[in-house]
């Protein structure tokens, strides 16, 4: 893809479990879905801009895989929602609106932990790994 130099895309399929734990007692599944998001974000950071990288985060969708368990989003409805976002070259592809409740809760918990144990201060970028690596690269000490 890089050698061709033409616009292309990679969309990895994660899950709502990439963002929060929706399915209890599923350690391996949840860990693998978090890894999918990390993979996509790393590729997005490392590859040229003409290669669009995204992650699709489906919630519960009725498919043959779900068998007799009802209550998921209709697969055609899901496809329409996802298709529009891919056409727009979005990198975070979402479908299930209520998941914002879970995301906001998780982000709030993280923000509270930072406020309590690692509050912002003047010059707090001194330990930012991105800034540190950029300086090392500029000083020709580190190459990535």
Question: Could you tell me what each predicted segment is?
Answer:
Residues 5, 48, 87:
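Short conserved AdoMet
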Residues 37, 47-61:
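Conserved Rossmann-fold SDR core element
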Residues 2, 6, 11-35, 41, ...:
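Catalytic loop of short-chain dehydrogenase/reductase
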Residues 55, 63, 67-108, 133-136:
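C-terminal helical subdomain
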Residues 32, 40, 61-66:
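Ser/Thr-centric signal marking residues that sit
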Residues 113-144:
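Non-catalytic terminal and boundary segments that flank Rossmann-like NAD(P)-dependent oxidoreductase
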């Amino acid at each position: 893809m890089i050698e061709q130099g033409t616009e292309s895309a990679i969309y990895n399929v994660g899950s709502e479990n990439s963002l929060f734990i929706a399915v209890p007692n599923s350690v391996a599944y949840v860990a693998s879905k978090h890894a999918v998001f990390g993979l996509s974000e790393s590729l997005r950071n490392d590859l040229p801009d003409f290669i669009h990288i995204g992650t699709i985060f489906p919630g519960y969708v009725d498919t043959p895989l779900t068998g007799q368990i009802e209550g998921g989003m209709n697969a055609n409805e899901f496809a329409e929602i996802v298709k529009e976002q891919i056409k727009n070259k979005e990198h975070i592809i979402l479908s299930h609106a209520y998941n914002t409740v879970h995301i906001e809760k998780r982000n709030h918990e993280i923000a509270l932990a930072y406020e309590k144990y690692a509050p912002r201060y003047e010059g707090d970028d001194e330990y930012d790994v991105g800034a540190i690596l950029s300086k090392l690269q500029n000083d020709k000490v580190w190459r990535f």
